[in-house]
Amino acid sequence: QICTNCCAGRKGCSYFSEDGTFICKGESNPENPKACPRNCDGRIAYGICPLS
């Protein structure tokens, strides 16, 4: 289980719950991170990111 939330997640990554339900896409660009809360979204179990 990863600790992140939709705001702080990497842009381009998709985040899913334990049972594979799509939760959201990440919104934070690593080059220019958004000001995001550092809380964990308990629904997010893993993220899938493109290999770019």
Swiss-Prot record:
Top-level taxonomic group: Eukaryota
GO terms of molecular function: serine-type endopeptidase inhibitor activity
Site annotation Reactive bond for trypsin: residues: 38-39
S-S bridge residues: 3-40, 6-24, 7-36, 13-49
Localization of this protein: Secreted
A cellular component annotation (GO) from this entry: extracellular region
Protein name: Proteinase inhibitor
Organism: Solanum melongena (Eggplant)
